[in-house]
């Protein structure tokens, strides 16, 4: 795999702190209001009152990446795992983000034709109601993060690290076999590649073999900083395997 699909909007789908994919469309759960018949025997006409709210299935189309991140979707489906799904908009539109509890109820892969990107459709069935997450959440703080390999070789990041810059690139060594990221945040819960990581502590090593990521290929790693009922901050790091 020489690259990973990437879209421009910066919208992410996360599950329990694990960034699963960048989305290519938005599908909020359809909302219906139950109609309750309250007609009595002496009513001159049928009386209907509003009842319980009901949210329908959400179907998402995402760029397909053949790695453990999206393989987790099938694992969740077969295990009937229920958790909190978060649709995370870019920071400028953070007030549109929302979360909803639910489970994976359908998965469909699409075969690409004529150089179109491979995509995957999957359906989430809500088990409760939608909660808007309109407040911006915590961010990384100085020194933000350190990205390094097993030696360790510390990778130079571009652009300069900042709590409010959300996309970075760097180049690894040719001989790098694993990647760790040490994040720093004064508040919030930090996840690196889906694994909860304490501030100032190296993440679980991310496998980075030459066979899986040959020279020139790109590994994308997400760092997510979350809080309670706030929009998570998502940082995307693209690591290109170097030639030296």
Regions found by a protein language model. Name each.
Residues 1-65, 99-121, 158-171:
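Solvent-exposed edge beta-strands and adjacent loop segments
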Residues 13-15, 87-94, 149, 223-229:
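Short acidic, glycine-rich loop/turn motifs
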Residues 64-68, 129-130:
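Acidic glycine-/aspartate-rich tracts in secreted/extracellular proteins
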Residues 69-105:
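Short, acidic/charged, Gly/Pro-enriched secondary-structure junctions
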Residues 71-73, 132-138:
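Short, charged, solvent-exposed linker or helix-capping segments at domain edges/interfaces
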Residues 117-134:
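Short solvent-exposed strand/turn elements
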Residues 135-244:
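Beta-rich interaction/scaffold domains
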């Amino acid at each position: 795999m020489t690259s990973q699909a990437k879209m421009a909007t910066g919208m992410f789908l996360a599950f329990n702190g694990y960034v699963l994919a960048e989305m290519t469309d938005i599908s909020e759960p359809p909302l219906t209001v139950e109609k309750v018949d309250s007609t009595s025997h002496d009513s001159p006409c049928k009386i209907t009152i509003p009842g319980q709210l009901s949210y329908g299935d959400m179907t998402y189309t995402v760029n397909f990446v053949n790695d453990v991140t999206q393989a987790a979707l099938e694992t969740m489906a077969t295990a009937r795992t229920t958790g909190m799904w978060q649709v995370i908009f870019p920071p400028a539109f953070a007030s549109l983000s929302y979360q909803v509890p639910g489970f994976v109820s359908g998965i469909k892969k699409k075969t690409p034709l004529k150089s179109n990107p491979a995509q995957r459709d999957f359906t989430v069935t809500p088990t409760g109601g939608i909660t808007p997450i309109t407040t911006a959440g915590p961010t990384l703080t100085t020194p933000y993060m350190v990205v390094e390999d097993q030696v360790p070789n510390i990778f130079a990041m571009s652009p300069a690290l900042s709590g409010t810059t959300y996309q970075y690139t760097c180049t690894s060594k040719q001989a790098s076999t694993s990647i760790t990221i040490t994040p720093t945040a004064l508040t919030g819960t930090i996840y690196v590649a889906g694994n909860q990581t304490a501030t100032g502590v190296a993440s679980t090593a991310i496998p980075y073999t030459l066979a899986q990521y040959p020279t020139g290929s790109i590994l994308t790693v997400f760092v997510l900083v979350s809080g309670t009922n706030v929009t998570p901050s998502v940082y995307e790091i693209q690591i290109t395997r170097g030639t030296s």
